[in-house]
């Protein structure tokens, strides 16, 4: 095989030129710089430069800021008008945006850390609104969950899974993280969750985001949490925790209806339930049951069935509708797989919680911008809107390109027959 070398400067990541153009045309640089404190005259790079450089690392196939230095930097610096900071500057800029952690002590005397970054949280929603991914005249479904992020940092702690790390609480709308608070790895999911949700709902109201429905697992099944959720949305759906009182009521149910949910048949029923005492407010408990696999009798229900309950204030919808709606939260849980493996949540760069919180929110913005890009390209039939970032890179980003000068004009030359010039037109 004969080989010849060429010194011609070809950028193998030509698609990033079009991503940068969208970034500028949408006004994201000015939004970012306006929303965050200025870096001052002594800094060569603005936060908008730092943000897009970090995002570009993911869009080009990297997973950390150091990839800018070792793999992509020279190619990115060849793009006219793109100021590309080094990895050190990118990381230093994120550290500047860190907020002070809050320390609380539980009734059992255990200290918990929580990191609330209001400027970054507000910017996340502003970016999503700017992209058209969130709108003021829509009632959204909110999913809330905690995600264990395994890591060994100075302030990471052992979780209940016996894995060291952080345990952030994350609000999700339409497959996007929209609010993030970082927490100690050992913190119980219910510990001060009502305060986290109250802050999230307050921020949503300030940004004009309406929450119509809330959907949560049994980690949100407590009186304080339910009161906060009910006060801030129209209807909620929370997985109920079984207890002796609930099982007593289930035994009294005589009318069950057989319904096909997904690919399986279940028996379903609804009852009025007072989870916090007969003198408190009653809710609707939607129950499903199915035979267990081993046929073993349950001591309390006196049958060989598996029971599951959903607590809700929705008295109008059919049981099947409520169950299918709740089961759809599995799609929201897949968001964590995407954030972990495509946008760096499984590789936290800093040694302190507050700095890693900035990173989590910044990469959530990166994910939101990516969602905007692929949905727009999907309308031009480049690919499906739900593709993972690896296919996006292969299908759009990795194309040979070169900036040339003709008639005193800079022209981007693409070595492909694909109509890149029409991609976002």
PLM region spans:
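Conserved oxyanion/phosphate-binding beta-strand-loop segments in alpha/beta enzyme cores
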Residues: 10-31
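Anion-binding and metal-coordination hotspots
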Residues: 1-10, 30-425
